[in-house]
């Protein structure tokens, strides 16, 4: 079964996120468990935790259908020690918040070398940052998102994702989230079914489907291989509908959150309905 949804707002309280996901007839959702543009947040209260869990139960969302995202400020590969420690503390807090909420995944951008340290050193710092957080939490998997490779951001090549995983001690608690827009901008073609087959065969060989724990389904305003991160609505960008139809009809993408971060929330319900319909089309073929 495919879990299909979008990154919904938690404005007004975390319990509002599953309700908003239900409004667009989603079977998955992503959210921020705190303000993503601030370092600090008030601790979760027992009431907030209970309300969120009750809402998830009410709208039939299990932890496997929810892909929380951490703060954009965090850089787990930061070249400066003080800033690295600040990011590691913030990441641990994010992992602990997931743990408290009964969530089992935390999606994050790996990190940037800021042109100050070697790529290999940055990747090693990211892996060590994950190890530190995993050692102090239980039950939450660190889910590394591939990037478009904009600026000095790492994680845009499958080999970089594999290198981070290689440095993580507990392989059972590390995974990846593939963002289709990021992959396309990083030079992985998805414009035809044949291109999708080739790209994901490469992913399977270098990273491994056993590590795929979520996806972000986004079309791309950015050009192929441009290393520019610009999302678009499904079928309206440079990737086109074929990739998303192909994903919906491939069983390797079952049982993980497939999350829209497309640019027009007003049509998320339509995009989700279209994605669901592609599965039906395959079943009837």
Swiss-Prot record:
Q: Which residues bind Zn(2+) 3?
A: 182, 229, 231
* GO process terms (BP): base-excision repair
Please tell me whether the keyword Membrane is annotated for this protein.
Answer: no
Q: What class of enzyme is it?
A: hydrolase
Per UniProt, the cofactor note for this protein states: Binds 3 Zn(2+) ions.
Residues bound to Zn(2+) 1 are 69, 109, 145
A GO molecular function held by the record: deoxyribonuclease IV (phage-T4-induced) activity
Q: Which cofactor does it need?
A: Zn(2+)
SUPFAM superfamilies reported in the protein's UniProt record: Xylose isomerase-like
EC number(s) per entry: 3.1.21.2
Catalysed reactions, semicolon-separated: Endonucleolytic cleavage to 5'-phosphooligonucleotide end-products
SMART domains (alphabetical): AP2Ec
Which annotated residues bind Zn(2+) 2? 145, 179, 216, 261
Spell out the PROSITE patterns in the cross-references: AP_NUCLEASE_F2_1 (PS00729), AP_NUCLEASE_F2_2 (PS00730), AP_NUCLEASE_F2_3 (PS00731), AP_NUCLEASE_F2_4 (PS51432)
Gene3D superfamilies reported in the protein's UniProt record: Divalent-metal-dependent TIM barrel enzymes
The alphabetical list of record keywords is: DNA damage, DNA repair, Endonuclease, Hydrolase, Metal-binding, Nuclease, Zinc
Q: Which InterPro entries match?
A: AP_endonuc_2, AP_endonuc_F2_Zn_BS, Xyl_isomerase-like_sf, Xyl_isomerase-like_TIM-brl
Please state which protein family the record places this protein in.
Belongs to the AP endonuclease 2 family.
Role summary: Endonuclease IV plays a role in DNA repair. It cleaves phosphodiester bonds at apurinic or apyrimidinic (AP) sites, generating a 3'-hydroxyl group and a 5'-terminal sugar phosphate.
Q: What is this protein called?
A: Probable endonuclease 4
Q: Which organism is it from?
A: Salmonella paratyphi C (strain RKS4594)
Q: What is the lineage of its organism?
A: Bacteria, Pseudomonadati, Pseudomonadota, Gammaproteobacteria, Enterobacterales
Annotated gene? nfo
């Amino acid at each position: 079964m495919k879990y299909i949804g979008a990154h919904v707002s938690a404005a007004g309280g975390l319990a509002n996120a599953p309700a908003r996901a239900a409004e667009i007839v989603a079977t998955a959702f992503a959210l921020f468990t705190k303000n993503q543009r601030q370092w600090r947040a008030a601790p979760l209260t027992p009431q907030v935790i209970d309300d969120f869990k009750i809402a998830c139960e009410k709208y039939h969302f299990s932890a496997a259908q929810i892909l929380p995202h951490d703060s954009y400020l965090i850089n787990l590969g930061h070249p400066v020690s003080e800033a690295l420690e600040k990011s590691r503390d913030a990441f641990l807090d994010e992992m602990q918040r997931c743990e408290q909420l009964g969530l089992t995944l935390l999606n994050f951008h790996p990190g940037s070398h800021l042109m100050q340290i070697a790529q290999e050193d940055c990747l090693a710092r990211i892996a060590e940052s994950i190890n530190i957080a995993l050692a102090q939490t239980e039950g939450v998997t660190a889910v590394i998102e591939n990037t478009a490779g904009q600026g000095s951001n790492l994680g845009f090549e499958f080999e970089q994702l594999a290198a981070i995983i290689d440095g993580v001690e507990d392989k059972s608690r590390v995974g990846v989230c593939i963002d289709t827009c990021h992959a396309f901008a990083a030079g992985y073609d998805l414009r035809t079914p044949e291109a999708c087959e080739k790209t994901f065969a490469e992913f399977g060989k270098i990273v491994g489907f056993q590590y795929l724990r979520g996806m972000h389904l986004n079309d791309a305003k950015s050009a192929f291989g441009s290393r520019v991160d610009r999302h678009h609505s499904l079928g309206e960008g440079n990737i086109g509908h074929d990739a998303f139809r192909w994903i919906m009809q491939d069983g390797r993408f079952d049982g993980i959150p497939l999350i829209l971060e497309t640019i027009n929330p007003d049509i998320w319900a339509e995009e989700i309905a279209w994605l669901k319909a592609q599965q039906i089309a395959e079943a009837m073929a």
